[in-house]
Amino acid sequence: MAGDFKHTERDLLVSKSKIQIKSLFKVFGNNPQGVMDLVNGGISKQELLENHGHVLGLRDINIDVPEKCIRVIMGLSGSGKSTLIRHINRLIEPTSGQVLVDEEDVLAMSDVELKNFRRSKASMVFQKFALLPHRTVMENVGYGLQIQKIPEAEAKTRSQHWIDRVGLTGFEDHYPAQLSGGMQQR
């Protein structure tokens, strides 16, 4: 069975990092920087909340995802999985730390660079998602391309590629209400 795996352990050690998260902290509250010494000193989440009115979302997260490698973020409800993922595309600003994608510092990106990054490199399916109910699957998939003013023929080709890739071939003309929840999320 080992021969079926695409990457050996050695391959992963020498491959280039796709995503690096270094010493990432997120504290929610009115003065996150003001409590960082306490957080670095090891204060508990409960004590930080009860005595200082701040919520510790992430504490010293370090992750390296090599190219062509899949990592799974698992944890209990409320453990910070979504908070962590939202830092990669900077939907949430960290209290401290570093996020690199293709060795580019996501936190240093300008608004224009960040917008392009989100369009081309960092997609995300939200836990609670919204589809346009009056548009078909094809129209929903192509909506972002339409907004970007991609020519209609190219947009349709690209949309069909992704519809095929996620296993919705044959449902292009269906509306969201005609799909199962799992199909809608795809």
PLM regions: where:
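Signature (C-motif/LSGGQ) region and adjacent switch/coupling loops
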Residues: S110, R118, M138, D164, ...
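ABC ATPase NBD coupling module
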Residues: L48-H52, V106-A122, I147, E152
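Conserved ABC ATPase "signature" region
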Residues: L38-E47, D102-D105, G142, Q146, ...
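Short coil-to-helix segment of the ABC ATPase nucleotide-binding domain corresponding to the Q-loop/switch region
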Residues: R135-G142
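Conserved ABC transporter NBD signature motif
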Residues: A2, H7, G97-D105
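Conserved ABC ATPase signature
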Residues: Y175-L179, M183
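Helix-to-loop junction immediately C-terminal to a conserved catalytic motif
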Residues: N89
